[in-house]
Amino acid sequence: MPSIKKQENSNAGGWFSSWFFSNTANEDQDDMLPSTSAAAGETNYARNQQTLSSLRSQKSANKPTTAQNRNSAATLVRTDTESYLDAPKSSRDQANGVLRRKVTRRLQLTNNNLVIDCPIPDRLLGALTFNDHDEFSQLRYTAATCEPDEFESRGFTLRPKIYNRETELFIVMTMYNEDEILFTRTMHGVMKNIAHLCSLKKSTMWGPDGWKKVVVCIVADGRQVVNKKVLDVLASMGVYQAGIAKNVVDDKPVKAHIYEYTTQISIDSDMNIKGSDKGIVPVQIMFCLKEKNAKKINSHRWFFNAFGPIIKPNVCILLDVGTRPGNSSIYQLWKVFDRNPLIGGACGEIRAMLGTACCQLLNPLVAAQNFEYKMSNILDKPLESVFGYISVLPGAFSAYRYAALKNDVNGHGPLEKYFIGEDLHSNLQGSSQSIKNTGLFEANMYLAEDRILCFELVAKKDERWLLQYVGSAFGETDVPSQLPEFISQRRRWLNGSFFAGVYGLIHFRKIWNSGHGFNRTLLLMIEGIYNVISLVFSWFSVGNFYIAFYFITKSLSASNVDPFGNGWGSRIFDFCKYAYAFLLFVIFICSMGNRPQGSKFLFMACLVGFAIIMCYMLFCSSWLIYKGIQLAAEKYDWTYDTTTNFQIAMSDPGLRNMVISLSSTYGIYLVSSCLHRQPFHMMTSFLPYLLLLPGYINILNIYAFCNTHDVSWGTKGDNSVAKDLGVVKVSEKEKGVKTVEIELPADQHDINCQYDEALFALDEKPSKDTGSGGSLTKDDYYRSFRTHLVLAWIACNALLVVFITTSDYESIFNASVGTTYMSIMLWVNCGLGIFRFLGSIMFLLLGIFTSG
């Protein structure tokens, strides 16, 4: 594949004066190329490999400065009448990516819609292995002037339908204002996955022409907030051109700008350009740039409701920009749908990015999240997969069968329930009557709309769809490395999961109206009971952790257990008890009226304080184990028979409880990690997770419940129409066909110039945006709901703590109400741990029998 090189040459028409050809064609990669037009492809491949390597060499060497670039452009980019940069400023509008030099052209509307086929830059065209089809030589722009649900009925269409192609995989990448590093990380990962599909020559579905069965849809949530360097990356790939989009067409405001192009260029996160010589195959890309910010759920509405009915895919892959899929992970996800026709949704493992040589593990917050992610993928997801219902398929990397998501003829189904969240949040920010009709319970519930989608999919009427976890597929993503962003992220997760969990339990009777058989329904009911217990534990988690702290640390107050002597065990307990209460008080104060970004140091101090308390709890636990063994050694007559000694140990309540406690938590963590052949996190991340555990439980839960009134979902009520891109009006009608006059690039030189500028921009370091988020005014109803919920939550946990801790208690080795409650909690936790462990084992066994 050719390369694009920047050299000064009087014959050039842009900033990159000419393309120099080198003899660096990589014939070893020829088997990765599509088989379309083999003879022409081989000729193009041999000729054009040189152009791409030229671009790479020029990009890494002899890079002129910005001033030199523009001076060169001023002398090199000329038409017959005037210099490009010498044109008047009025005709070189630089605002928001409008082309600097334009001419007015007359075009016919397509089905009363503005659709423009724009030639791609000469530099890019010369670098392509395949350039004999308009999908390679022209960028198609469509100005969507309707809502997503009306897209097909308003006469809009897409290239895959025009080419009569059947789409097996429809991949969506949603983004907001992520930078070019995050974007290229995901985009290049997707490109490599599609190349992997094309390398499967023995597959009946894939092979060299497999790229024709895959469509990648990129949805940007708001034209004004999208990162400009991401647009430069897309322009370099040929997927985007500035200056052709318009704000209004025939007096109708444009809702979304849709660009379609089949690219043969990929750019990695180091801004290196990759082509067919690096194994890149053609990829059909659809870039949907929404005019206004309407949040991720609206982006999915465009994907599912606007493009889905036209594309008619078999499997939809959902990705967040910033998540890098493994090189064959998309194929691994697709394979479970192909193997089992009852699979309606699937997800892979979400891994935390740990940096070069896992250096990010030096950050305790990242290490704790790494441990949390790993154990969730080892214990929780496999367990739920065995039952057939995964409570949440993470939107960062998951897949759905499109037929399973579709609504019925009456418009009822999973997608209907899923998109209620968008309308619901719009109502909450509207009139007071809308607030009365809706409620914040539903609003918080739809903060985790992906959980609602999973439940409605499994419970779909008269259907029997299942959800599955695919351990061989993974996606890597950045996790918050700073405490404020971590708290903000978990606030939405915790509130959404809690209220969505309540929703699932309330509506679990829908399972009986689905098409599942008796055995599967019974399994789902068992999982429902497990979810009820987990939800109750979540509600009382703050109180239960304090009770555990209270009894473990107070046990060292007893004179026969005190390791310090002279009553120091009791003094330290009193200090820790008051310190614990003070930290809780500080968290409540900070959570009720402050953003984590504004109270960063207070939250950090509380996290450190709880970590210190946890260190003391670990010391107390270790000492109690030592004393328990010592007391048992003095109390019983031990033998040389292991079985007899085990029976003696289990007959002692204190020693038995300690053994069960260790085995049902740390033992299960270690054994299950080894069985899944992933023990590394136990060595690197277990201790940070253990130390931050009280912070997880107290800080995150308190902040989440104290902010249930915050259900803001971005820019609502903004009905203004921008005019910066221009307005297209109907000038006349000819034989019933509307004709418009529109400003477009003056000639090919202008297109080439803009492409050169985008390539140069890839080497520029982006400026960091450190702007602070604005505050939103909340209605009294929001805060009233929050107040009542928090009061109920505090009352439940406080009553539990008061009832248990006011009993007579000396140490964990003496019977009391406290030790009885601790024993009950211990056995319940042990049962839940064993239940998760058995589910994980069953998942591994099922994987052995279903592999292949």
UniProtKB/Swiss-Prot annotation:
GO terms for cellular component: cell septum; plasma membrane. It is a multi-pass membrane protein. GO terms for molecular function: chitin synthase activity. SUPFAM superfamilies: Nucleotide-diphospho-sugar transferases. GO terms for biological process: cell wall organization; chitin biosynthetic process. This is Chitin synthase 1. It is found in: Cell membrane.
